[in-house]
UniProtKB/Swiss-Prot annotation:
One of its GO terms (biological process) is L-tryptophan biosynthetic process. It catalyses: N-(5-phospho-beta-D-ribosyl)anthranilate = 1-(2-carboxyphenylamino)-1-deoxy-D-ribulose 5-phosphate. This is N-(5'-phosphoribosyl)anthranilate isomerase. Pathway: Amino-acid biosynthesis; L-tryptophan biosynthesis; L-tryptophan from chorismate: step 3/5. Keywords: Amino-acid biosynthesis, Aromatic amino acid biosynthesis, Isomerase, Tryptophan biosynthesis. CDD domains: PRAI (cd00405). It comes from Mesorhizobium japonicum (strain LMG 29417 / CECT 9101 / MAFF 303099). Belongs to the TrpF family. GO terms for molecular function: phosphoribosylanthranilate isomerase activity. The lineage of its organism: Bacteria, Pseudomonadati, Pseudomonadota, Alphaproteobacteria, Hyphomicrobiales. PANTHER family: N-(5'-PHOSPHORIBOSYL)ANTHRANILATE ISOMERASE (PTHR42894:SF1).
Length: 219
């Protein structure tokens, strides 16, 4: 099974080059002002040019207004929207129709009962991103470097397309792939030398760890 890999929170040409060079299927740009990974729409539009024909460029937003989304879509020309806030199913459907783009809906998980939150979005969201619930007091809905118990995904309905996120890094990606067997993975803080600072060497290390883990499973 092919594994989609998204490097999220990109802000520099060097990080983009490392992500694409490693074989990222998706590259993500954060449009949430409180995040250290925030990037201006015009700059994201410049950066995403390197990904054309190589990777899916994802615009990550958090309860964004229509006006801000219009600016993002115009300046960046994303291939996909990722909604990482409290957007309800009707809002997801509205934005899909407004922009004609596929939507990935992020949902925070911590226990098996949280899987019930997926059902209202089935048939509306094109894909899900499962992240850990933010630590108490955190202003960031994602990118907190926190993992959840991946074993709860065993209760997921067959056919649900998703990316696994939350606290992934080179040290634990093998366990994550073994326990959850996800169709896709998303990493942000796990390839940073400081909050918001992507490290090309850590990106390369992560891709090596993914390849090693997949080789071990295939052996």
């Amino acid at each position: 099974m092919a594994l989609d890999i998204k490097i999220c929170g990109l802000k520099t040409d060097q990080a983009m080059a490392a992500a694409l060079g490693g074989g990222a299927s998706h590259v993500g740009f954060i449009f949430f002002a409180k995040s250290p990974r925030y990037v201006e729409p015009a700059e994201a539009g410049r950066l995403r040019e390197a990904a054309r024909g190589k990777a899916v460029a994802v615009a990550v937003t958090v309860d964004a207004t229509d006006a801000f989304l219009d600016e993002i879509v115009s300046a960046m020309q994303p291939d996909m929207l990722q909604l990482h806030g409290s957007e309800h199913p009707e809002r997801v459907a509205e934005l899909k129709a407004r922009y004609g783009l596929p939507v990935m809906k992020a949902l925070p998980l911590s226990e098996a009962a949280d899987l019930d939150r997926i059902r209202p979005f089935i048939g509306i969201a094109d894909r899900f991103l499962f992240d850990a619930k933010p630590p108490k007091g955190s202003e960031l809905p994602g990118g907190n470097g926190v993992a959840f118990d991946w074993r709860i995904l065993a209760g997921l309905d067959a056919g649900v397309d998703y990316m696994l996120s939350g606290g992934l890094n080179a040290a634990n990606i093998g366990d994550a792939l073994r326990l959850a067997n996800p169709p896709g993975i998303d990493i942000s803080s796990g390839v940073e030398s400081a909050p918001g600072v992507k490290d090309p060497a850590l990106i390369e290390q992560f891709f090596r760890a993914v390849r090693a883990a997949r080789d071990d499973r295939a052996a």
